[in-house]
């Protein structure tokens, strides 16, 4: 194989790896969103107290922003927007597959159908809240990422990675928690999921603090991925203008 052929294979593999990570993290987030996690802290914070409370999807979902930021940096604004929109459609594919499996008749030797439904069948509140939060926050992430790139003339990748993710994660957190656990229960959709205002704020703050920490600590990995793939010929060495 020629050098050009090897470089072309590397480009294809690297791009597919980012897309694969993005979609895998996104689907995992949907499947783990119903579990609420609680991590004890050695100190007390305003609102959250001595524990961080957050949805089980927080880690997986934070990885989607890592993937989309790498993709936006390497391939541009419009390809990143297409990645986000394809991911949105894949959510519906995943939900269709899960709910069709739940609806299908179970063999006698199978796991209990009700347990299966409980584990994999996310409530309407979780589905609607997460899809709406995804659509708004991920598109904002791409827009903010490229605006910051324009302002910094292509320098300071850390600023656009942290800045775009911090703002988009705030949007995502507020939309998801408020829709799933306040707005829809108030409208009569699974009212048992409704949470008091204090708990809602604690859930929002805990989730956002965790996501913000992930955004800060994943910055060296963004540099590593972008640097490696640029060295393999994925893009011009340092883009100076947004698409």
Task: List each language-model region with its residue ranges.
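Alpha-helical transmembrane segments and their helix-start/interface "positive-inside/aromatic belt" motifs
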Residues: 8-20, 72-87
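Structural signature of hydrophobic alpha-helical transmembrane segments
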Residues: 52-63
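C-terminal ends of transmembrane helices
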Residues: 2-6, 66-78, 222
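Interfacial/capping segments of alpha-helical transmembrane domains
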Residues: 35-47, 53-54, 104
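Alpha-helical transmembrane segments of multi-pass membrane proteins
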Residues: 23-39
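Membrane-embedded alpha-helical bundles of multi-pass transporters/translocases
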Residues: 81-83, 87-94, 100-137, 147-148, ...
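Haloarchaeal acidic low-complexity proteome signature biased toward cell-envelope/secretome components but also
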Residues: 1-20, 229-243
């Amino acid at each position: 194989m020629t050098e050009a052929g090897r470089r072309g294979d590397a480009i294809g593999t690297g791009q597919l790896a980012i897309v694969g990570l993005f979609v895998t993290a996104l689907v995992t987030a949907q499947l783990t969103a119903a579990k609420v996690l609680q991590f004890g802290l050695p100190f007390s914070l305003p609102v959250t107290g001595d524990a961080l409370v957050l949805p089980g999807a927080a880690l997986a979902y934070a990885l989607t922003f890592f993937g989309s930021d790498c993709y936006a940096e390497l391939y541009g604004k419009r390809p990143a927007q297409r990645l986000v929109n394809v991911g949105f459609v894949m959510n519906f594919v995943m939900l269709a597959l899960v709910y069709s499996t739940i609806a299908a008749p179970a063999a006698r030797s199978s796991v209990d159908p009700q347990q299966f439904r409980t584990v994999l069948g996310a409530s309407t509140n979780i589905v609607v809240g997460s899809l709406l939060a995804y659509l708004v926050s991920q598109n904002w992430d791409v827009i903010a990422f490229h605006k910051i790139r324009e302002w910094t003339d292509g320098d300071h990748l850390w600023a656009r990675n942290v800045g775009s993710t911090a703002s988009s994660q705030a949007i995502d957190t507020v939309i998801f928690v408020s829709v799933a656990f306040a707005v829809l229960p108030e409208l009569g959709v699974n009212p048992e999921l409704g949470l008091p205002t204090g708990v809602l704020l604690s859930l929002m703050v805990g989730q956002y603090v965790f996501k913000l920490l992930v955004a800060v600590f994943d910055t060296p990995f963004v540099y590593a991925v972008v640097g490696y793939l640029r060295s393999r010929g994925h893009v011009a060495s340092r883009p100076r203008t947004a698409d």
